[in-house]
Each structure stands twice: as C-alpha cells, then as structure tokens.
Amino acid sequence: MSAYAREMRVLCISGKRFAGKDTLARLLVEAAGRQGITLSTYAFAGESKRMFAAARPEVELARLLDDRAYKETWRPQLTAFTVESLAADPLVFVRAVMRRIQAPALITDLRLRHELAHLCTVCEPQVVRITRNDEHRAASGWAFDPTKDTHHTETELDDPSLWNEVVHNDGSEAALAVHADALLSRWLARSDAPRSDR
C-alpha cells in the first residue's frame, strides 16, 4: 500500500452514464492546478487496460487508452482478460490502483459497493455523486438501454447515504466548473487535505 493511503482522503466520482464524470474530473484537475496542486486521476477500468498491456508486449498501452479504433481491435481479448481477472479477484483493479497512488488522487469511475468498502479500509474516500437529468444526458448522446442502465454497475451506488457530496450537472460546462471549484475548496479546507506543490 502506498504511503499516501490512510493519511489523506481520496476523491471518488460516482454517477450514471453520460452524467459528466470525465468532465467533472477534468475540471477538478484544472481547479487544483490553479491552486498549485497536482491532482492525479485514476480509473479502475483503465487499470484493466494497463494490466492487459503489461501481459501482452505487442499491445501499445497509450493507444489502448486513447485510440478508440485501436481499442476496438483488442476488445474481445481485453474483455476476456477483464472478466477472467475479476472472476479470480473482484478487487484486482482496485488494489492495483491503490498500489500506484502516490499523490493527491481522484478516482473517476467508482461504481460498486465492494470497491467503496475496500477503499474505506485503506483510505478515506470522499464520494462525489454527479447527477444529470435525462434530457441533458440525451443531448450528450445517452439513450436508455435496459441492459446497460439497469446493470449493477449503474445502480449499486444509487443510495444517497453512500455519497459525501452531490454535484448537479444540469447546466453549462461553465456552471459545472463553478461546482468543481467549490467542491475542491471544501475538500482543501479539511485538515487532512493535500497542500500546494508550490
């Protein structure tokens, strides 16, 4: 476990598909940067790609992370690797992320109760739930899919008692940026929050 764990809180973003998780993460990183703090981002889903690439030397990790067409060529093998890895250890990617955390951290894709339960044993996660109404989600490309939208990865963290903060994303990106700044300021006001790198 990294020295970072237990000493500081980790921000974790939870939310439905097309709620704006990645956008909020980017805005939080930008807000932290303006205050001289490097906020590193981690994703459990991304960790499966890292581990897959480590096991397959012919796979280019950078392209797997950022090149959609390239990722599609490897999707069947990546999916099989992910399923097999999770069957062997449901926390394999969570543990891998926590071993790498060495700085103020933002987890961008908290989805499952057992992920949160594990985080609570090794650090102090602060769960930020981002919400967005269906009209705005649809404007970004969301369409209800009963298979995806009722899957446990979309619903396990619907209980508000699991959230520390709620960010409503029903306006512009500029409005969301204001929420991100306020959220970061509240986090930094805590005695155990990270301080400026400057």
Residue ranges and their predicted role:
Residues 24:
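Hydrophobic positions on the alpha1 helix immediately C-terminal to the Walker A/P-loop
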Residues 91-92, 130-198:
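Small-molecule kinase domains that catalyze NTP-dependent phosphoryl transfer to phosphate-bearing small molecules
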Residues 43-105:
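ATP-dependent small-molecule kinase phosphotransfer cores
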Residues 30-40:
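Post-Walker A helix-loop "phosphate-sensing" segment adjacent to the P-loop in P-loop NTPases
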